[in-house]
Amino acid sequence: LSVFAACTAMSAMAQSPVVTTWGDQGNGTYVNPILNADYSDPDAIRVGDKYYMVASDFHFMGMQMLESDDLVNWTLVSKVYDRINLTQYEEMDAYAEGSWAPALRYHDGKFWVFFCTPYDGLFMTTATDPQGPWAPLHHVKDVDNWEDPCPFWDEDGQAYLGRSILGAGPIIIHKMSPDGRELLDEGRTVYTGPVAEGTKIHKFGEYYYLSIPEGGVQTGWQTILRSKNIYGPYEKKVVLEQGMTAINGPHQGSIVDTPDGEWWFLHFQERNPIGRVVHLQP
């Protein structure tokens, strides 16, 4: 997990004095974490030569949209929403119950953000520009104990939404209207694992891939599931785990490609009291 971070740190020290103890070192290398602040459950995409990221905002209304040229240095460019128009938020009675584990996607010329709150269900919004304006939040489904949604649009035009159940999984996939404003069925369970959550859906060639964390925040690992059918059955491989480092529970993040064909993984590490800081792995 942290071999690359360690190597970049040593490379930075060998070439010039370390600028900071984290992030961009000013000489073409970086040291994890790249964001030494509370950005839990990051999801990121590339659009053209720019990268965009969102993260959970448990108790600070707005959900930040971040932009980067290099996956290391990030700038705040907008707030995805200003308020959740439900009574408990108006009365300051929903601490830590805001937006959990959002998904960010670019489809049909628009940026799409989906998220759940633990007791209010599924919300979504869109914008044609990452700087906004963002459409008012649409409350897709009022339901308890959903988490970690991710939309996916297949080549045949069918849209889907993957999600899990608060605290323990499993992974469930629904058919969804193409505009993202309605779920079309009750969903099908496609995978059950230990605290399976954080679903991110991709398709490469003829295979559907689900990238999920398992095992819980403190001691978990990252799993990739693969199938030729979005409903499975899925084959499974653990692709990232703690190993012998102090970087506990590599957890819940996003796979993103670069214009020249490299692949990188952004994930969080719980590091209290700071919160959940963001790491970047090749």
Q: How should these model regions be labeled?
A:
Residues 14-282:
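Carbohydrate-active catalytic/glycan-binding domains of CAZyme proteins
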